[in-house]
Structures are given as C-alpha cells and as structure tokens.
Amino acid sequence: MVQKSTIDFAKDLADHNTKAWVAANRDALNAARGDLLTLGLELIERADEYDPEIAQAGLEARHLTRYNRDPRFLHGKPPFRTDLDLFFNAGSGAERVGYNLHVEPGDCYAGASLFIPSPPALARMRDLNATRTDEWNRIISAKPFVAAFPNGIEAYAELKTAPRGYSVDHPAIAFLRMKGLGTRSKLTEHQVCADDLVDRLLPIFRAVKPMVTFLNTGA
C-alpha cells in the first residue's frame, strides 16, 4: 500500500510548488520516496508471481523517477513534478520496457512502459512491430490485456509521419510512429492506499507481461 501521507505530500506540493517549500519539507519528500521504495521492494520480492525474469534479476527498489524537473526544460512549468513513480525492469532503464506504478493525486495508474527509450531500443522495438506484426496484434488484443488496459497502447510522443525506412501504409504504422509507449490501468487513490494494493497490481502486471517480453526481445 501507499501511505496516505504520500498522497497528501503530492497534493501539498501541487499547492506549494516552489524550491523554498520543498527545501522546508525535505523530510516529507524523503518519507514519500521511501514509502514507494518500500512498495517497490515488495513488488520485486513477489515478481515470480508475474515475471520470472524480474525475480531473477537481483533488483533493488531504487528505481524512482526524479521528482524535480530539469530547469533546461521548464518552459513555464512549475519547478517540481507532483507525481511519484516506480519503474523497474530486468536491465538498463532506457533499453528495456519495464513495469511501473504512477502515483499522482487524481491520476494513479499501473502498467508497463518505456516512455523515453534510447535510439537503439526504439529502433529495435520498431523492427519487432514491423516484422512480427501479427504476433504483436495477438498480444495487445488478448482478453486479459484489453480488460486491464482499455485504452490499449498509449504513446509518450509520436512522429507526424512514418519513421525513416518504413512505409506510411505499413499495418503497424500507428505503433511505428510512437517515440515511446506505455499502458495505463487506472487506479483510484483509495485503491492505491489500500492494504491489498500489491495483490491488485499483480494481475495488471501479469496481463502486460507478454507485451514486456515481446518488446524486450533482443535487448
């Protein structure tokens, strides 16, 4: 479960999104991050219930997204992110699709993603989609997948046309245009803070595991 204090911290940060406020509430920030790290450790410890590769990878619960934005990319946005994320995979972060939990007031979800892949990882995933399109379509149309992720595959960003080397008429063009992708199974704040959160997350991860395995082929 995620502690209610973690949700409350994210809400407070949204209302007081300044460097001075964060500096004055550093202990609350560290407690919120530590809360998600504890949850991440439990998810890794139970990985044999959804992905044996994760279970065998010897991971640590240390894969939290940085909470602060890079000032080079602010463009008028608040200085700090108001979400906390767990992300873990069985390899390099930018090379392999992994499982994730996103905790943000009013927008909590779980699934799998590689929203900002390295160029080689993106090229590899595009090649998989282009050359094994039928297999890909079977994975994302499977009943457990559709039930868990009614919005299907979501793009982090996408090209306006086909990537170099691919036809705009390719049957997988919708996915080939994606520059990063993920799935989202929506969760309420009540569900995120409930004692049975991990038991709720396991079937979500099991539903997306075939996608994870497919997109990590050759990684």
Give residue ranges: language-model regions.
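Phosphate-proximal small/polar/acidic motifs at interfaces that engage nucleotide phosphates
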Residues: 22
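Soluble extramembrane domains of integral membrane proteins
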Residues: 60-89, 98, 138-156
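Long, solvent-exposed, polar/charged low-complexity segments
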Residues: 2-15, 19, 36-44, 141-142, ...
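Aromatic- and glycine-enriched beta-alpha-beta binding-site module
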Residues: 70-131
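Gly/Pro-rich turn-and-neighbor structural signature
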Residues: 30-76
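Compact, glycine/acidic-enriched structural inserts
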Residues: 104-161, 165
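Alpha-helical scaffold domains
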Residues: 55-56, 82, 177
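Short histidine-centered catalytic/ligand-binding loop motif
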Residues: 25-32, 114, 125-129, 193, ...
